[in-house]
């Protein structure tokens, strides 16, 4: 209704959404099964992205809950030892259990859980960035609205977290936006 679509068009859009979500789940299983070489990859601004990753400095990477981040695993294999994923503590344990239970090899990333001790998480992020590592966030998820900014996004107002950019600015590291889609 928010998009002003009729009933039939809304049903079609919902079906397409579920279809793409199903493809994403299949991609996740395929990546965990070691089939990443069966996929073809296409990148936007690939040379600039590699230039930033190879610079030796820390990088803040911002993704979204869209597509399948595991689809990028083939690309990030060489860079994986330097990846730190920042996530909510409750999700951390659930995701850790799923990944460790299904992974065919050892994980190639570190998780920085956000919990009641936000200072500890911030210090871990600072250490990682100072060591030339990458910290990855999902930019479409935040707690509360105190540290957000309201901007126009795809024709509507949307809240986005400011903290990700503040961390990058304070640590003087570049920000890279990343997503992978089928």
Label every PLM stretch briefly:
Residues 6-9, 13-16, 55-116, 131, ...:
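Catalytic core of membrane glycerolipid acyltransferases/transacylases, capturing the structured
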Residues 39-41, 47, 64, 148-152, ...:
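Flexible, active-site-adjacent loop/turn segments at secondary-structure boundaries
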Residues 23-24, 100, 139-140:
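Short, flexible segments with low predicted structural confidence
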Residues 1-60, 67:
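Membrane-proximal helical "anchor" segments flanking the first transmembrane region
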Residues 44, 120-121, 159-163:
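Short, conserved clusters of charged catalytic residues that mark active-site
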Residues 48, 120-125:
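Short acidic active-site motifs
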Residues 50, 74, 126, 165-166:
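Alpha-helical segments flanking ligand/cofactor-binding loops in enzyme cores
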Residues 81-84, 127-182:
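Membrane-associated lipid acylation/remodeling enzymes share a hydrophobic transmembrane-juxtamembrane segment
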């Amino acid at each position: 209704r928010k998009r002003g679509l009729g009933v039939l068009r809304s049903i079609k859009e919902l079906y397409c959404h579920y279809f793409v979500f199903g493809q994403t789940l299949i991609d996740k299983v395929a990546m965990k099964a070691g089939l990443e070489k069966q996929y073809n990859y296409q990148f936007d601004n690939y040379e600039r992205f590699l230039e930033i990753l190879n610079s030796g400095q820390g990088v803040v990477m911002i993704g979204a809950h869209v597509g399948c981040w595991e689809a990028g695993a083939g690309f990030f294999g060489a860079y994986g030892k330097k990846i730190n994923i920042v996530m909510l503590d409750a999700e951390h344990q659930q995701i850790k259990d799923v990944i460790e239970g299904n992974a065919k090899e050892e994980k190639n990333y570190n998780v920085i859980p956000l919990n009641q001790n936000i200072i500890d998480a911030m210090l871990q992020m600072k250490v990682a960035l100072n060591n030339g590592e990458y910290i990855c966030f999902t930019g479409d998820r935040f707690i509360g609205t105190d540290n957000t900014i309201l901007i126009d996004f795809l024709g509507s107002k949307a809240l986005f977290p400011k903290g990700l950019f503040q961390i990058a600015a304070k640590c003087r590291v570049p920000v890279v936006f990343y997503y992978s889609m089928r």
